[in-house]
């Protein structure tokens, strides 16, 4: 049987990425051009800057992916692209490149939801068993998703305010840490103790909604008041206390969801899934009867490899889009 090759494009935020997937789950290439250095001085992603960087490198990413995979355009069977959610300007750059490439090479276009990509990155670890529950944690999203079968997603809980990754970056900025702050906070947290006792919003309520704005505000107020009074704060303990509160919230809601939706598999994905503290808590707090599947670190952040892994499923269902496909920056799972 002829091998199948899918080229995937991801540009929803501040990474330009192009990947090549062979057959169902063999990633031959996953080129990622990161913009982190460009956004550090701003303390966050500047949409206009992100869009310009995508324009500068996207063609090179296509070339590098094909070269690394050892194939040419005529070997490809489809092109997949993230069409939302994300920054509209950033999405449009990747979509324009993907659509032009698909048109020039007479290839079908597969539209992929960015968050579905994060979820399906877990396919790199093992073939997923359905139905399953997913905890998706990133800079822009915090969601619990019930997946009855491949491609059938239902959000059963989400944040009412800040996403968990956003909260990490905001408190990191207050402490003077480098953007993005998640990894550094995680490392410092492992050296400290939970001594500041921050609030855990809605942790005892039965619903599956999250909230991190109160935790963020409590952290900022503590830090500000200490500065005003000239009191010294222990950085490691601050990070440990903040992370303990975040993880308590995430684990409490996930455990409630597992009781409500009796599944055998829990996928934890998104940029924050790289957090070692979260991985440790999942190992100790989640029942051994639940198969916890977390993508490898290389597939936790934004990358086109995860888009390709999601696209393999959509290809089988012949879920193709016309070249009139437009970016949907606020795309939800229910829109699939």
From Swiss-Prot:
Its main location: cytoplasm. Binds 1 Fe(2+) ion per subunit. Fe cation binds at residues 114, 118, 302. One of its GO terms (cellular component) is cytoplasm. Keywords: Acyltransferase, Cytoplasm, Iron, Metal-binding, Transferase, tRNA processing. SUPFAM superfamilies: Actin-like ATPase domain. Gene3D superfamilies: 3.30.420.40. It is found in: Cytoplasm. The keyword Iron applies. One of its GO terms (biological process) is tRNA threonylcarbamoyladenosine modification. GO terms for molecular function: iron ion binding; N(6)-L-threonylcarbamoyladenine synthase activity. It comes from the Bacteria. Its cofactor is Fe(2+). It is an enzyme of class 2 (transferase). Substrate binds at residues 136-140, 169, 182, 186, 275. Belongs to the KAE1 / TsaD family. Required for the formation of a threonylcarbamoyl group on adenosine at position 37 (t(6)A37) in tRNAs that read codons beginning with adenine. Is involved in the transfer of the threonylcarbamoyl moiety of threonylcarbamoyl-AMP (TC-AMP) to the N6 group of A37, together with TsaE and TsaB. TsaD likely plays a direct catalytic role in this reaction. This is tRNA N6-adenosine threonylcarbamoyltransferase. It comes from Streptococcus agalactiae serotype V (strain ATCC BAA-611 / 2603 V/R).
